[in-house]
Amino acid sequence: KELCIRTIQKNVVYLRPNADGVTAHKPAVQQNIVKSTVCAHSYYIIMYVRCAQTINLKTMAERIRIKDIAERAGVSVGTVDRVLHDRPNVSKPAREKVEQALKEMNYQPNMYASALAYNKAYTFYLLIPKHESEAYWEEIEEGARKCEDQRRDFHIDLEIRFYERSNEDSFKAVSEEILDAKPEGVIIVPSSLEVTRGFTDQLHQKGIPFILLDSYMPDLRPLSFYGQDSFCSGYFAAKMLMMLAGNEKEVMLMRQTKDGHVVSKQQDNREVGFRHYMHDHFPQIVINVLDLPLNGTRNEYQKMMAQYFDEHPATHHCITMTSKAHLVGDYLLKSNRRDVQIMGYDMVGKNAKCLREGSISFLIAQHAYMQGYYCVDTLFRAIVLKKKVNPVNYMPIELLMKENIDFYRRTQI
């Protein structure tokens, strides 16, 4: 079989099997087009391309220096430097000439090199609720720490602080500690709107940019937001659930509450989306609510669920808007109930275990690790690199089941 190879460089080596192994030799004459007859167990051809020689020379030739900009604009090098760094003492005509030259030359500053040369240390704070091991918040911490590690050359230091969920005084106390530390940027998982506003108003006054995580409150005017669209997520969850439960008379909605209220704005918005879909498409189906206390014990939860299913034997489908679907899943396994399907949120370890064992049918993943990573990275790009960032960043709504859970990449960025 005739083989034709167009070589980028004149580096063709023939490998020929022999009794001692494989020997290599170069042909005496090297051409840009090499023709050879290749037979089975006879000759092998390898082509080398040295990466160092494939550098785009045009890009190197087009590297723009401050001197080039000054010559193009007809001003001094010092004037160009002041414009690039937005310093004063530049006349309006000179600034316009430089800006026009930058535009014509398509100048792109090397922000990374400038930031490294500046050699300044930056402290960011992450304020999140206290949580137990393997929770959704732990994945956010992991992602945030990963970004901190990857940006260590820029002297980024991430401090994580915790507040008691549904305890406004705890949120206020920790937020005051953060303000006293005078950080360069803050990431906030909000408490109630008004309590969080008291914190963010002070951040605005001090010129400290902040990012909202998990719950979007546009009235607070954050630099950016990361999280799911909670309403759409709840709407989607209802639609998926009713593909299975369309012929049922009732479903169970499990919530986590404190003093009669759900413990997060996100959980509340998901429920609104869920009920909106049910009202529009399945108004005849009864939604039974089971409220589990936030600080309850596992034994208390087991008793409450046993009582619920004794009183509602017709319930065969459950949904929860939190990461605690495993509480119902564990109960179903222990009570050997195989006629109930559960849908919940978050790919935390306990939920994943129940999903694999079959006590949970579906999970909606919201990429907590990714949220934590990108919150820190967004502060880095906005504060250190002086780049514009997207104000709203919704996470994908991803449906997981037993058949595809092993393909979910929890730490993928």
Predicted regions mapped to residue ranges:
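Hinge/beta->alpha junction and helix N-cap segments in small-molecule ligand-binding domains
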Residues: 129-138, 159-170, 227-233, 255-273, ...
